[in-house]
Amino acid sequence: MNYSIDLADYGYNGECTPDVARVSAVHKERYGLITPFGMTYGFLKPGSYMLGDQPYPTAGDFVRIEFNPSGDSRIIETLPRRSLFSRMEAGPLMREQAVAANFDYVLLVTSLNHDFNPRRMERYLTVAFNSGASPVIVLTKADLCPDYQSKIAEMEISAPGVPVHAVSVYTGLGMDALGQYARPRATLVLLGSSGVGKSSLLNALAGSYEMRVNSTRDVDSSKGRHTTTHRQLIMLDSGAMVIDTPGMRELGMWCAGDGLDAAFPDVEAVLARGCRFSNCRHESEPGCAVRAALENGELDPERWRRYQALQAENRRSDERQALKRERQEHMKGIAMKRKELKRKGR
């Protein structure tokens, strides 16, 4: 069979072989796949993912498959990822939800209406930095905000060193600046709350209006509505790819890793100086670098408190994950012992 698609054009750096595909969409238990032979669908091979020793695929993943030219292919393995954006799944089960994988830029989208919240962006930046890709902040609906330049400056305070762009898909304002990220073979992921204009932004980047868009143009309306119902990867005319994701009502912290320090470089710079005592709680101890920075105005007290809140949330998440792993190992040990006893006929 001759190849009709070069997976290198879809960001794959390895050898293009018949058993490699990229996940283009996630529909519950069925996956859209880009293969060397064209677009198809696939499902997880029974048993391949049951033991939990490899991650379930998400949009943007490269996977190994058993290609079926006459029907759905079988996905047998998720290949190593170069970047991953994940969050805590909503609900009581405390599971990681992989949102997107193998991307170069995270476009954090928020609108210049009532959704505008630089403080909330710090949470998104923490997770984005930890993903392994470069975050970019996009402020949509700039045509509805006469003082959008001041909003850019306000956002830059909460996101030191991160590019911030104000755009309008209706007037074209700022759209050219996004072209530097949409280069051939690069993958971008769009993340943000419901109704901030991700689908409209994607349509503008793609030069078409294929996505269903629910208008939230009313400047007095702050309630966003989901216009994307599943995660999907779309090829642009520029040769770049965009992973669109459903709007997020909340972004639960799964693992901040080094992302917290990267999102708060001003705080990290103060902490790097070191306090007199290694176990300093940064409260009233003598020789505390943080207290000194707070008192001389170098460090903003509110920003320090938000850093502490995210740090505490991440610590609780780590502790819960460790406890869950311990329980899983315990249950696995019991299952193995029962299996051994059954084998011996006891």
Q: Which sequence ranges carry the predicted segments?
A:
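N-terminal accessory targeting/assembly segments
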Residues: 1-118
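Conserved ATPase-coupling elements of RecA-like P-loop NTPase cores
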Residues: 117-119, 146-152, 252-255
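Conserved active-site beta-strand-loop modules that form the wall/rim of enzyme catalytic pockets
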Residues: 187-189, 195, 199-203, 232-233, ...
